[in-house]
Amino acid sequence: MEADNGGPNSSHASKQRLRWTHELHERFVDAVAQLGGPDRATPKGVLRVMGVQGLTIYHVKSHLQKYRLAKYLPDSSSEGKKTDKKESGDMLSGLDGSSGMQITEALKLQMEVQKRLHEQLEVQRQLQLRIEAQGKYLKKIIEEQQRLSGVLGEPSAPVTGDSDPATPAPTSESPLQDKSGKDCGPDKSLSVDESLSSYREPLTPDSGCNIGSPDESTGEERLSKKPRLVRGAAGYTPDIVVGHPILESGLNTSYHQSDHVLAFDQPSTSLLGAEEQLDKVSGDNL
């Protein structure tokens, strides 16, 4: 310990400066600790415990005050700093942990969403494939049905064109015969005037009802117009009745002779008289 000599007076000697070395400070700290700490230690007690020569109560009091200030203020500031650091560290760690958890959760959600999207895409692809397969199957069925309908329709076409088996088959008569039959089929009962008028008509090859020669047709007309005697109230009068058409195409003389039968109720003399009378009337008309 070094003391400055300040002069002869005692007041100046009591206020001489003291340099606190490391050893002296250690002894001061031990004395304060023995006395119960900086709060309980008193300058007199510290001075007595230290027992250093030249050390005054003023020196101990001043150093004790500085020690107390240095003891409490740095401790409080350090504690405050430590608390702040601890809180800030906790906050940072909490933030880091929460942010890490949030990031992890976000990544998990993103992966889940991607997985679901992938599954949906796969389902859509499978559905598209099924739709295409179903369309091809339906198209094949339609083509098969059209082919079968075409095959069944081909043999059925001739069957529909045939005549109904229930209906009678058409006759083999030619249209010429039908026409000639219609044209040459007059009433079976003709009057004498109509038969006589037929003699006056010229016979030409173009006649539809006259196919043979003029001589043959004349003979046929004479044979066809045989008189038939009908018994009346006054006597017997000749009545000419034609049972068949006078002129028919395609028929021979023998047919007309066999068909026209004369019925007489009187003897042959009456028939001859009627023929003469008929020939006379025919000659007058010609």
From Swiss-Prot:
Annotated Basic and acidic residues bias: 78-89
Keywords, comma-separated and alphabetical: Coiled coil, DNA-binding, Nucleus, Transcription, Transcription regulation
GO biological process: regulation of DNA-templated transcription
Entry keyword annotation includes Nucleus: yes
Molecular function as annotated in GO: DNA binding; DNA-binding transcription factor activity
GO cellular component, one term: nucleus
Sequence motif: LHEQLE, positions: 117-122
Residue ranges, annotated region (Disordered): 74-97, 152-227
Principal subcellular localisation of the protein: nucleus
Gene3D superfamilies membership: Homeodomain-like (1.10.10.60)
Coiled-coil positions: 104-124
Family annotation (PROSITE patterns): HTH_MYB
Cell compartments where the protein resides: Nucleus
Cross-referenced InterPro entries: Homeodomain-like_sf, Myb_CC_LHEQLE, Myb_dom, Myb_dom_plants, PHR1-like, SANT/Myb
Domain (HTH myb-type) ranges: 12-72
Residue ranges for the DNA-binding region feature of this UniProt entry: 43-68
Source taxon at top rank: Eukaryota
Similarity section: Belongs to the MYB-CC family.
Record protein name field: Myb family transcription factor PHL7
